[in-house]
């Protein structure tokens, strides 16, 4: 019966995750009555951390930890030792949101209530640890554009599921190639630019991926929101500038030593700063925008971020090369 009831709740919801075996007692009971009840009850859960205090309509009004019950005298009333700092979870709450609540409030367990606010189950930290592992794995799979069961699916089905974002990626790659084609004459005149181009694109892509990973994770945990988005965008842009200047000096010196041309060193150094600043900026802005559009940034953001850093990197490097070297 419990299994059938659980299947009536949405998949990946608190209703599916919760345990129905719990200890609920009225507020007017004493510690002694509560202990006697637990000793006599054949349906207690094997392991539990908290007792839930309910009103006559079976709505949770407080909690008491098992250790606190055992430390108090038998005559003490439950409502005198209970905590009213409750975090009831709706049965329909998504398990990712549920895990965020546990993480933010350092909960050990939390009551689950139905639409009428009545206690129907409990979620414990043991269950939430599994959810956090599942969600982290799911986000990792999405960022790679693959599915969890790809290892066991037929080759054609796997290829079809991966083809969508590969098709989007090839369109963005052609856009980057179009930018390069605008500077054919420059590349023909200064072959060193063709040699150094991958460095600019690679550094921008890696810097953007670092920022993107932080932003996607912060969005998933609700640490990145409208209230602090501008501050995080500014911070990551400044980080990009610092790294850009540091690596610009390094790459500029290497390019100068390689080609014996100061101007080539200056061009790639300037392009490096521009691309890493842009990488820091778009690494936050793009996932935030996708999240606002209800598109999962873990799936789509990396493609668009890579496109921007490639286009900006090539445009800055080859554009500066055209202005300075020709």
Which residues does each PLM region occupy?
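Cytosolic regulatory modules rich in charged/polar residues
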Residues: 1-195
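Alpha-helical transmembrane segments and their membrane-interface boundaries
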Residues: 132, 136-281, 285-308, 316-326
């Amino acid at each position: 019966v419990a299994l059938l009831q659980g299947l009536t709740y949405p998949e990946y919801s608190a209703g599916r995750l919760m345990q129905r075996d719990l200890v609920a007692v009225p507020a007017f009971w004493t510690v002694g009555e509560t202990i006697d009840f637990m000793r006599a009850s054949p349906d207690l859960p094997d392991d539990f951390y908290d007792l839930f205090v309910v009103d006559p309509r079976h709505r949770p009004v407080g909690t008491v930890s098992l250790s606190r019950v055992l430390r108090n005298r038998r005559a003490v009333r439950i409502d005198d030792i209970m905590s009213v700092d409750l975090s009831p979870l709706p049965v329909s709450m998504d398990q990712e949101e549920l895990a965020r609540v546990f993480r933010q409030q350092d909960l050990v367990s939390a009551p689950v209530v139905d639409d009428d606010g009545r206690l129907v189950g409990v979620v414990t930290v043991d269950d939430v640890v599994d959810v956090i592992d599942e969600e982290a794995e799911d986000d990792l799979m999405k960022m790679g554009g693959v599915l969890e069961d790809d290892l066991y699916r037929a080759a054609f089905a796997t290829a079809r599921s991966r083809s969508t974002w590969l098709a989007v990626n090839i369109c963005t790659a052609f856009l980057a190639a179009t930018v390069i084609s605008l500077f054919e004459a420059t590349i023909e005149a200064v072959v060193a630019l063709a040699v150094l181009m991958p460095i600019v694109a690679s550094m921008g892509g890696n810097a953007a991926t670092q920022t993107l990973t932080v932003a996607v994770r912060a969005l998933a945990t609700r640490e990145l929101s409208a209230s602090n988005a501008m501050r995080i965008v500014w911070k990551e842009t400044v980080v990009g500038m610092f790294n850009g200047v540091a690596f610009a000096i390094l790459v500029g010196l290497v390019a100068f030593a390689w080609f014996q041309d100061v101007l080539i060193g200056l061009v790639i150094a300037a392009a490096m700063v521009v691309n890493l600043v842009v990488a820091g900026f778009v690494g936050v802005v793009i996932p935030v925008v996708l999240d606002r559009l209800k598109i999962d940034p873990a799936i789509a953001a990396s493609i668009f971020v890579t496109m921007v850093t490639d286009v900006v990197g090539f445009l800055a490097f080859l554009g500066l090369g055209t202005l300075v070297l020709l």
